Amino acid sequence: MSQQKQKQCAPPQQCCPPPQQRCPPPQQCCPPPQQCCPPPQQCCPPPQQCCPPPQQCCPPPQQCCPPPQQYCPPPQQTKQPCQPPPKCQEPCAPKCPPPQQCQTSKQK
């Protein structure tokens, strides 16, 4: 009896259709062109990379800016609290430690 590529899934896991690939239990199924992303996300196309939650998928020219690390916009570096990074940026803006605030380099 030739065994087909059918694997029994444990209760925490689920089976995906043959064209799709199975992701870890917290995740679901992703179509073959897409790749599995860590949970809270689901799938991202192959050229794009997975980003943390406030973000999703970013195109290859752009990067995912880490949500825990905040940044200040390059044109406006004032004494204001750092704001969370956008979904995707081509160059990630300069990072600013959360306890500190972004300041302009004072030239005296």
Swiss-Prot record:
Region annotated Disordered, chain positions: 1-24, 73-108
Pro residues bias locations: 14-24, 73-100
GO BP annotations, alphabetical order: positive regulation of keratinocyte differentiation
Biased composition (Low complexity): 1-13
Organism superkingdom: Eukaryota
Record function comment: Positively regulates keratinocyte differentiation by inducing genes associated with epidermal differentiation.
Protein name as it appears in the record: Small proline-rich protein 5
Species this protein is from: Homo sapiens (Human)
